[in-house]
Amino acid sequence: MASPTIAANAYANLARVLENSGAGKGSEASGQSFASLLKDAVGSVMESGRKSDAQTVAMAAGKANVMDVVTAVADTDVAVSTLVSVRDRVISAYEDIMKMPI
């Protein structure tokens, strides 16, 4: 299970991404699209996974500390959990919209 500090850092990173993307500013023409926001989020999760894999390989080669590997894996776990939560909410919203009468 991820520590509260790791979770707080993940949510702070997400808030920073949303702030930089212009989310919450209304329908501003210069804002980032929802698709590009999701693409950035998925890219961030993939990068976190790559870092975790690199730390694991480095530990197997004797070049990394176990604590670094555990931290990298926990960061990846939080990122994936956050992405899964977002996916679930998007699916739920889509299902709610599909149930609405025309």
Swiss-Prot record:
The keyword Cell wall biogenesis/degradation is annotated on this UniProt entry: no
Transmembrane segments: none
One Pfam family of this chain: FliE
Organism: Bradyrhizobium diazoefficiens (strain JCM 10833 / BCRC 13528 / IAM 13628 / NBRC 14792 / USDA 110)
Family: Belongs to the FliE family.
Localization per Swiss-Prot or TrEMBL: Bacterial flagellum basal body
HAMAP family with a match to the protein in the record: FliE
The encoding gene: fliE1
Protein name: Flagellar hook-basal body complex protein FliE 1
